[in-house]
Amino acid sequence: MPELPEVETIARGVDERVRGDRIVQVWFGSHREPFKTPPARQARELEGRAILAVHRTGKHIVCELGSASGGPLEERSGRMEAQWIVHLGMTGRLLVTAPDALLAPHTHARLSLSSGRELRFVDPRRFGRLEFRDLGRGAGFSAPGAEPLTIGPEAFAALFRGRRLAIKAALLNQRLLAGVGNIYADESLFRAGIRPRRMAGRLTGPVLERLRLALREVLEDAIRLGGSSVSDYVDADGMRGFFQLEHCVYRRSGLPCLRCQTPIRRILLAGRGTHYCPQCQL
């Protein structure tokens, strides 16, 4: 599943390419699984709207939309009136393509834009979700957990205070931290020198601060390298990321630790494969 760096990379790429465009026409596939809002309503609501901006919230991509009418001035300075929310699920892709680009199998949505390009949602396993929100009728989307890139020391420590669960499981809890998944939990715990089984509520303030900084550093490094392409992930242009080449523990079971040469171990924790160095992580 794409995690925070992958979703951030896609959102930035889409924003750079479609900001200021207007949605001219919408086509949705026949499968109903991706649609949190009924597809007929989504198509009707999306057509004609200006795309004001695209950003990430947690593991979701949020397209900020203006009204369904108005000229070029509104397209650039209009007020957000609606949102189109994309969750990539396990295998989802959000691509900006030429209109005549080969249609990938499992394409569930095509938005034709005023620039002549298309915004396409492709999802082979169909765990992704597409949702439309009219801000005149309800609240905009917000992730339930804290933002790992900006959370401060005190707020970060408070997330884990009294938690009787392993720190790896706590990092994966989207109600605590939005966007952290298996890859970046393993990698940040390695950088911080913390064993994934340690109880979150027993970690001291200095140890948690070390983890906060390591997590932010790992996420920023991954964004800089375009994310981790360990499976289907590609960015908005269909290009793979490179952070998988920097992984220190994730999917390196049995291989020597890059710091101390001790073999990396793999255990099952919180239902997820978990990788760590028994020498470097205490």
Across the structure, where does each feature detected by a protein language model lie?
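Gly/Gly-Pro- and Ser/Thr-rich, intrinsically disordered tail segments characteristic of DNA damage-repair
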Residues: M1-F127, T150, G205, R252
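Short, contiguous clusters of charged residues that form electrostatic/catalytic patches at enzyme active sites
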Residues: T9, E154, A158, L213
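Basic, nucleic-acid-binding surfaces and adjacent catalytic neighborhoods in DNA/RNA-processing proteins
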Residues: I23-E45, H55, H60-V62, L159-L282
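Intrinsically disordered, low-complexity segments enriched in small/polar residues
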Residues: A68-S69, R76, G136-G138, R224-L225, ...
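Phosphate/anion-contacting hairpin/loop surfaces
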Residues: M80-R191, M199
